[in-house]
């Protein structure tokens, strides 16, 4: 549903005169990382109304009250971007859990002692099963740094228990196998598990999502965003 239709005429025409009007035409990235998008939004709101380290426990739709681990908050309209299945659980909306599925992604951020072999690409996909990862990206090529820094992504089923240390050794081995590194020394690393990462879209979930969102909106609850709207989209 995300890939554009491949028209034979357009393919032949692009051989003669290439053009690109996709979201990849221009690529920008803040110097401080993607967190700068959040910081920019934060500077435009009242900081007294921003609450951190506060967990939503449940939502009382009838009383229009959100219960957290610290307090109860009365609301007129509630806008949520948390994953839709989690919101349904919090708001006590019945749904078939079998039709909502997703995967986990283990992400490694790796820093090495010297520049890598690939000095051109920003990111590369690896569809071959012989590699543990499906995509890597080069921070150093984006920022024109003189030492290799990568993000490496590995996909898993949502019910898998993931040992990050175990997979770090495998990733280093596969990076060497792919020719990304050779005698490089790893000097810094950190990992994070995205759960959910990519949602699985099917006819049943798309249909049920309409029902759920209509029910939520009756109580002035609006579920938005990549995970709130349970869809695949880019930044």
Role assignments for model-derived ranges:
Residues 54-179, 206-216:
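Mid-domain catalytic core of redox enzymes
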Residues 44, 83-86, 229:
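Short, well-ordered alpha-helical scaffold segment located
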Residues 25-28, 159-160, 231:
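Active-site rim elements
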Residues 51-53, 187-190, 222:
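General small-molecule cofactor/ligand-binding pocket signal
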Residues 180-181, 191-235:
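C-terminal catalytic lobe of FAD-dependent flavoproteins
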Residues 1-62:
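Active-site/ligand-binding neighborhood in enzyme catalytic cores
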Residues 47-50, 75, 177-187:
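Surface-exposed helix-capping loop/turn segments at secondary-structure junctions
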């Amino acid at each position: 549903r995300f890939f554009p239709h491949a028209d034979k005429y357009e393919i032949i025409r692009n051989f003669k005169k290439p053009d690109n009007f996709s979201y990849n035409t221009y690529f920008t990235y803040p110097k401080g990382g993607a967190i700068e998008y959040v910081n920019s939004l934060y500077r435009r709101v009242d900081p007294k109304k921003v609450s951190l380290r506060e967990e939503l426990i449940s939502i009382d739709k009838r009383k229009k009250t959100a219960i957290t681990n610290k307090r109860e908050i009365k609301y007129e309209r509630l806008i949520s971007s948390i994953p839709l299945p989690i919101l349904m659980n919090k708001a006590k909306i019945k749904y078939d859990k079998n039709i909502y599925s997703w995967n986990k992604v283990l992400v490694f951020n790796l820093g090495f002692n010297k520049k890598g072999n690939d000095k051109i690409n920003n990111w590369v996909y690896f569809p071959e099963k012989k590699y543990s990862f499906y995509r890597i990206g080069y921070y150093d090529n984006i920022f024109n740094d003189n030492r290799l820094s990568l993000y490496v992504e590995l996909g898993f089923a949502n019910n898998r228990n993931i040992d990050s240390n175990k997979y770090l050794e495998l990733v280093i081995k596969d990076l060497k196998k792919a020719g990304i590194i050779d005698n490089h020394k790893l000097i810094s690393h950190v990992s994070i598990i995205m759960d959910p990462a990519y949602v699985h879209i099917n006819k049943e979930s798309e249909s049920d999502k309409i029902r759920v969102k209509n029910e939520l909106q009756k109580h002035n609850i609006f579920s938005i965003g990549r995970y709130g709207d349970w869809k695949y989209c880019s930044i």
